[in-house]
Design a protein with these regions (language model features):
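Conserved catalytic region of serine esterases and O-acyltransferases that act on ester linkages
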Residues: 1-9, 17-20, 192-207
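Conserved SGNH/GDSL esterase-like catalytic core that processes O-acyl groups on lipids
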Residues: 2-103
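Alpha/beta-hydrolase-fold catalytic nucleophile elbow
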Residues: 81, 120-121
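Generic structural signal for well-ordered alpha-helices
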Residues: 101-106, 150
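A short helix->loop->beta-strand "cap" motif at the edges of active sites that frequently abuts
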Residues: 112-116
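Catalytic His-Asp segment of secreted/periplasmic serine-dependent ester chemistry enzymes
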Residues: 124-207
Length: 207
């Protein structure tokens, strides 16, 4: 069983005891690694958040597991960050990424018409601060490509009457890159980086 499959099986078990009508996070590693529940606990918050993101997922994979990662929980609000792994793959064209994303949104709307959907802007990267083994990936997943993708994600949100949220300002240096001190290897974000955006994110959890 792969790491992805093991996580999915664990989520299926955890869903049996989960409280419905709460908040769900889903997507790939940048959402999986966001320690939202740790930060909420530090503030004494009673907001219930279920993180159902799985590292390594592309849009096509999330489409196949919406039952486990969204539907079974019947959330009142779902936050999605999916597509960055697609952006890192030169074989996957942008229009296909957005077609898959569109299908994900439509599926949620059909199954859970009362659920509010929040599409999160993709985070910036930092090629200069990247580990050597990440530089090839970041030649494909550039900040220019991320900016273009974010404009399309925003259009998707508008098309569906859903929400697009960009909380990236706190992550960026003067050149619009992910701040070097906030990244693990040029691409993923460390806890300090997530703290820098949590206050902005919290507004959407609370409102």
């Amino acid at each position: 069983m792969t790491d992805k499959e093991m996580k999915l099986e664990r989520f299926k078990e955890e869903n049996k005891d989960a409280v419905k009508g709460q908040i769900v996070l889903t997507g790939s590693s940048l959402m999986e690694m966001f320690p939202v529940n740790k930060f909420l606990a530090e503030r004494g918050s009673d907001i219930i958040v279920y993180n159902r993101a799985i590292g390594g997922y592309i849009t096509d994979e999330l489409m196949q597991v919406l039952d486990t990662c969204v539907f079974e929980l019947e959330p009142r609000r779902v936050f999605i960050n999916i597509g960055t792994n697609d952006l890192s793959d030169s074989r996957i064209p942008m229009d296909r990424i957005m077609e898959h994303y569109d299908s994900i949104i439509s599926s949620i709307e059909q199954r859970l018409p009362k659920t509010e959907i929040y599409l999160m802007a993709y985070y910036p990267v930092n090629y200069e601060a990247a580990a050597e083994n990440m530089k090839e990936c970041l030649k494909i997943r550039t900040n220019e490509k991320i900016t273009a993708a974010n404009a399309l994600v925003k259009q998707l949100a508008e098309k569906h009457g859903q929400h697009y949220i960009d909380i990236n300002d706190g992550l960026k240096d003067e050149q619009g890159r992910l701040k070097a001190e906030y990244t693990i290897e040029g691409l993923h974000i460390n806890e300090q980086g997530y703290r820098a955006i949590f206050d902005d994110f919290l507004k959407y959890l609370e409102n």
